[in-house]
């Protein structure tokens, strides 16, 4: 068994390539003001998926997976925004999509997961990225009001306190010697 594992380790994995990048226009999306305020987050993501499809004349039936990161999957960004946006963009219903949450690293984790799936041979073609409309997160979404990262688990909070993100960044920089 050990010999088989060693032999498999020496085999080369399929390479994964990023062939394009697209994003939405920057703008203010705060409720009631700004050029993006009336857009649904899924519709905004769908415009990006439509553009990628158009640029490369993609047959969406050939897309093995859409991997989308979104750290606030509630309200308008809930219900697997990656899958809903793919359907909104006109993707074939056989093309799957998933939404994952790794807080601020959700988008890059999605790209990494898509690449890993290709490199392992599980998928041939993936579309990956992130979707987040900050106006629909904690301050304006009633489902998120008073919600904490630990989901209200007081025992977990006791073991792992939740300082503010900015304080965490300063602490990590100090501990790791970044200036």
Question: Can you annotate each of these PLM segments?
Answer:
Residues 2-95, 131-179:
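Conserved "HGTGT" condensation-loop signature of ketosynthase/thiolase-family condensing enzymes
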Residues 100-132, 173-179:
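Active-site-proximal alpha-helical scaffold in enzymes
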């Amino acid at each position: 068994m050990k010999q088989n594992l060693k032999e498999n380790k020496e085999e080369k994995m399929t390479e994964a390539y990023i062939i394009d990048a697209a994003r939405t226009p920057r703008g203010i999306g705060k409720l009631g003001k700004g050029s993006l305020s009336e857009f649904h987050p899924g519709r905004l993501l769908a415009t990006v998926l439509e553009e990628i499809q158009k640029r490369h004349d993609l047959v969406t039936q050939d897309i093995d997976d859409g991997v989308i990161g979104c750290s606030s999957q509630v309200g308008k960004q809930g219900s697997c925004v990656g899958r809903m946006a793919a359907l909104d963009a006109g993707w074939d219903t056989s093309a799957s999509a998933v939404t994952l949450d790794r807080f601020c690293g959700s988008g890059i984790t999605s790209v990494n997961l898509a690449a890993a799936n290709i490199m392992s041979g599980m998928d041939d073609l993936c579309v990956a990225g992130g979707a987040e409309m900050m106006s629909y997160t904690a301050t304006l979404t009633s489902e998120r009001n008073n919600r904490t990262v630990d989901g209200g688990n007081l025992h977990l909070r006791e073991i792992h306190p939740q300082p503010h993100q900015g304080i965490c960044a300063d602490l990590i920089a100090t501990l790791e010697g970044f200036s």
